[in-house]
């Protein structure tokens, strides 16, 4: 009877995962219709819905197991035996790797993230490595320019499954061919082979055609973002073939793609050639399998720990008032723990901070907010923790620690991509780097605002610089929606004494923000302030922020490009800004 019960439990978990991934694919499959109908609010809603599906179905399975097994559901040995049976269901199962992560999630929900041992859950995969690289059915089509690139692209784009007319397909093909001819030699292009994924990758207002361009000297990405104009006609906005560009398109600071992948391991294996710098975790994250990505991130961490002897240290940069941040010197992740007590000027709670991190995961990150993975009961060997960090942990987060003798358990933390803090980057930057990164910093604030996110604390220390020179926000404890903020101009002083007073002569409500004050607390360096004012002086105008708020309230969703504007084939967009003159001087705001 026990054996039958264990088998029933294993099958219940796998069936629960089937139900979850079936709904995942169903929501994903709707991306084409949402794109064709230009239903951008539905795009954002579907993104949130798909993220919530996983935890919802884990909860359903846990409830089923409690009904089926009763008290045995709390018996770790029973679940260890059941894991053995579950493993036996996976050799012929097409989504084995994510099914293992789903099992882990069910186990952790039952045991409150305790007793996390390899005999009880899938710390590492039970399946042979070769299964991760198998592509059992074609997921891409191959094209060869036998009759020239023009004809080949006509055939390729004619096969695109979108049910909308093209604005001017011959023009776009000319753009692509001209770009390729300026990037590669005629001999390279004559010997090229192009492999294109069968499924389009949907995100924001674009449908991406993803391909591999195989040339005699290597494999290159081939990415075409397809947009549609206000009349519902399609156009190709650019062609990207550089690995750095592809890396940013699939970057950790962007929302997940909607791409129909009934066998995700096959798609990840196919993507490796064009994204060699991405880890397995990053590739699963890019296609929306964020919970399995969390599993893979942890495996990458364990592999790094096993291969190195480094100690954890306090992360470089200004210490946070809300988060304790630590890292390994050569590891590309940081670990963030919410402090037990915050600095007096921080009027937030731990629950509010966690809600902000969840908001970021569900919101459109527009390439400007880093994604995070959340872990509970994270175990670290004490000898791997530097004395300085150990002291800091016991001083700042003792309520989140459990001492196991040789090991330390951190009850809750976030893992996040490591970047160079912007304030440290500025200290080492040359003149050109300084110009570029200040331009990026202002762009990051503007793009977040256009996506209905107000960063709150916009100090340099709260932003990081990626290896591609992108500026990304990573301090979320004060973020809120743009529509929740009251942007005000500072009223003129009533008397001369007002300007000399220590306290403001005007009332200030909790959500009041005065953009005129930004230059004073953002930039103490005069040269940096001058640069910032030249490039982004509009951020100091309340009218700029109010105009953005009005567009958001009217339901306008801004275009988001995962590449530099100069890479666009043509400037089809309307003017970005209108310049007006008011009492504060010249002020730019969105057109």
Swiss-Prot record:
The active site is at residue 371. It catalyses: L-seryl-[isocitrate dehydrogenase] + ATP = O-phospho-L-seryl-[isocitrate dehydrogenase] + ADP + H(+). ATP binds at residues 315-321, 336. GO terms for biological process: glucose metabolic process; glyoxylate cycle; tricarboxylic acid cycle. GO terms for cellular component: cytoplasm. InterPro entries: AceK_kinase, AceK_regulatory, Isocitrate_DH_AceK. Keywords: ATP-binding, Cytoplasm, Glyoxylate bypass, Hydrolase, Kinase, Nucleotide-binding, Protein phosphatase, Serine/threonine-protein kinase, Transferase, Tricarboxylic acid cycle. This is Isocitrate dehydrogenase kinase/phosphatase. It comes from Pectobacterium atrosepticum (strain SCRI 1043 / ATCC BAA-672). The gene is aceK.
């Amino acid at each position: 009877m026990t054996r039958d019960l264990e088998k029933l439990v294993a099958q219940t978990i796998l069936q629960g995962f089937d139900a979850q991934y079936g709904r995942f694919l169903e929501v994903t499959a709707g991306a084409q219709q949402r794109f064709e109908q230009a239903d951008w609010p539905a795009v954002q809603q579907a993104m949130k819905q798909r993220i919530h599906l996983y935890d919802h179905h884990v909860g359903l399975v846990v409830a089923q197991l409690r009904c089926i097994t009763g008290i045995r559901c709390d018996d770790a040995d029973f679940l260890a035996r059941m894991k053995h049976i579950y493993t036996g269901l996976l050799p012929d199962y097409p989504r084995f790797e994510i099914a293992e992560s789903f099992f882990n999630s069910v186990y952790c929900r039952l045991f409150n993230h305790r007793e996390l041992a390899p005999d009880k859950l899938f710390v590492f995969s039970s399946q042979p490595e070769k299964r991760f690289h198998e592509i059992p059915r074609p997921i891409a089509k191959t094209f060869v320019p036998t009759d020239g690139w023009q004809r080949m692209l006509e055939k390729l784009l004619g096969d695109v499954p979108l049910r909308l007319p093209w604005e001017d397909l011959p023009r776009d093909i000319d753009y692509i061919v001209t770009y390729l001819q300026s990037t590669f030699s005629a001999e390279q292009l004559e010997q090229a082979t192009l492999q294109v994924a069968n499924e389009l990758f949907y995100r924001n207002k674009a449908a991406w055609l993803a391909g591999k361009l195989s040339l005699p000297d290597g494999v290159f990405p081939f990415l075409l973002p397809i947009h549609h104009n206000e009349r519902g006609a399609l156009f190709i906005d650019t062609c990207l073939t550089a690995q750095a560009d592809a890396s940013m398109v699939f970057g950790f600071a962007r929302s997940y793609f909607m791409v129909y992948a009934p066998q995700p391991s096959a798609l990840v294996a196919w993507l490796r050639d064009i994204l060699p710098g991405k880890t397995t975790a990053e590739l699963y994250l890019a296609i929306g399998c964020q919970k399995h990505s969390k599993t893979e991130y942890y495996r990458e961490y364990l592999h790094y720990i096993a291969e190195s002897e480094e100690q954890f240290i306090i992360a470089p940069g200004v210490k946070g008032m809300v988060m304790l941040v630590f890292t390994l010197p050569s590891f590309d992740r940081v670990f963030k723990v919410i402090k037990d007590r915050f600095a007096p000027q921080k009027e937030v709670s731990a629950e509010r901070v966690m809600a902000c991190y969840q908001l970021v995961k569900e919101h459109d990150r527009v390439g400007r907010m880093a994604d995070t993975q959340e872990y509970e009961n994270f175990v670290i060997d004490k000898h791997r923790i530097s004395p300085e960090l150990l002291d800091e942990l016991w001083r700042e987060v003792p309520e989140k620690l459990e001492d196991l003798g040789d090991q330390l358990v951190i009850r809750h933390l976030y893992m996040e991509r490591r970047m160079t803090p912007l304030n440290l980057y500025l200290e080492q930057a040359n003149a050109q780097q300084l110009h570029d990164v200040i331009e990026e910093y202002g762009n990051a604030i503007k793009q977040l605002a256009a996506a209905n996110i107000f960063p709150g604390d916009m100090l340099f220390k709260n932003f990081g610089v990626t290896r591609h020179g992108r500026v990304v926000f990573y301090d979320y404890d004060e973020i809120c929606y743009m529509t929740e903020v009251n942007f005000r101009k500072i009223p003129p002083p009533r008397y001369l004494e007002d300007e000399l007073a220590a306290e403001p002569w005007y009332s200030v409500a909790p959500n009041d923000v005065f953009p005129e004050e930004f230059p004073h607390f953002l930039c103490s360096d005069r040269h940096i302030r001058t640069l910032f004012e030249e490039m982004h002086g509009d951020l100091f105008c309340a009218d700029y922020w109010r105009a953005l708020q009005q567009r958001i309230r009217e339901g306008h969703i801004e275009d988001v490009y995962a590449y530099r504007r100069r890479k666009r084939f043509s400037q089809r967009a309307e003017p970005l800004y209108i310049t007006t003159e008011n009492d504060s001087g010249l002020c730019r705001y969105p057109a």
